[in-house]
């Protein structure tokens, strides 16, 4: 389960809408399964059907999350412009890499893959998944109150 606020979901949706017609992307930082900050990123692929977090943004986010704040990368988010909020074959293929011996390793170990569908722009659909060994598993997103 990933705990996230409605405000953070709205931040992700606003970012991916602003990136349309290309996929939008970013990362989620926090601790103990609770998102503490949303980190929008540029899509280096500049594509409506795939995303790659821009290397400069990735470096900045990882430094901020892991070194400055002592948090973890809890999730990676991206949009699907015209398809459901479910990992595509490309998403699955790019979530892991071959270690050279046929063993697959996650690019972002333990991170939840959050997919935001903009197929119905008035009602974006936001869902979470794990992708491990090319298998997709649903991860509940628990919407929690904003802290003051």
Regions found by a protein language model. Name each.
Residues 1-73, 81-148:
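Conserved beta-strand-loop surface patch within small alpha/beta domains used
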Residues 76:
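Conserved, mostly hydrophobic/aromatic
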């Amino acid at each position: 389960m990933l705990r996230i606020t409605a405000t953070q979901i709205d931040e992700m949706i606003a970012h991916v809408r602003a990136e349309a017609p290309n996929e939008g992307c970013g990362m989620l930082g926090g601790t103990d399964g609770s998102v503490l900050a949303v980190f929008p990123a540029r899509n280096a692929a500049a594509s409506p059907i795939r995303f790659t977090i821009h290397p400069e943004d990735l470096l900045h986010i990882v430094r901020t999350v892991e070194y400055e704040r002592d948090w973890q990368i809890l999730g990676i988010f991206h949009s699907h412009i015209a398809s459901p909020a479910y990992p595509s074959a490309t998403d699955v293929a790019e979530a892991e890499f071959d270690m050279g011996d046929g063993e697959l390793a996650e690019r972002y170990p333990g991170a939840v893959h959050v997919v935001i569908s903009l197929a119905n722009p008035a009602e974006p659909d936001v869902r979470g998944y794990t992708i491990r060994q090319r298998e997709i598993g649903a991860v509940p997103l628990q919407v929690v109150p904003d802290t003051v």
